[in-house]
Amino acid sequence: MNQTLETGTTTVGITLKDAVIMATERRVTMENFIMHKNGKKLFQIDTYTGMTIAGLVGDAQVLVRYMKAELELYRLQRRVNMPIEAVATLLSNMLNQVKYMPYMVQLLVGGIDTAPHVFSIDAAGGSVEDIYASTGSGSPFVYGVLESQYSEKMTVDEGVDLVIRAISAAKQRDSASGGMIDVAVITRKDGYVQLPTDQIESRIRKLGLIL
């Protein structure tokens, strides 16, 4: 189970004073074979909430659909968005209920309500909130970058550059991570905004990194 969970992805989420930034790369692998170079691993599940996926693609995509439906129903019934902690708790409970036949996934949930939040959630439903988190086979390299360069006082632009550097570090050392980088910024003012690919490419070049 652990081998399945840790293969083929690098995702990251960080909190700043007034924002959350989430990022993934796009490579999809099956053991040593690159199945897809443009896999989607970063999703908007509500106005102010994003989710990243690692693990079995089918399991992860089902959970994304479930969460989108649950959060939309909550918003229609109560006329407010579900708090981020409640989103993480709901997803955690869903996974824990099937822990003996688990969804083979590692997930990040990030968003902003009264404050920015990032939660990492494992296949058994374990949920941990932190100022930053990473999942997938490239996560050790991401944590190396974050531990030395992260600051809660960063601007959004600095935070975007940081997650790009972190994912790029994983791509250089982890053969199961690669391809283009996807980045989303979540703020109270604008909600969930995924940055255009050409903007990410421009930032990568400016930082002197390899596409």
Curated annotation (Swiss-Prot):
Enzyme class: hydrolase
Maturation-removed propeptide residues: 1-8
Subcellular location: Cytoplasm
Active site: 9 (nucleophile)
A single GO cellular-component term on record: proteasome core complex, beta-subunit complex
One biological process term in Gene Ontology: proteasomal protein catabolic process
Record NCBIfam families: arc_protsome_B
Name of the protein in its database record: Proteasome subunit beta
Gene name per UniProt: psmB
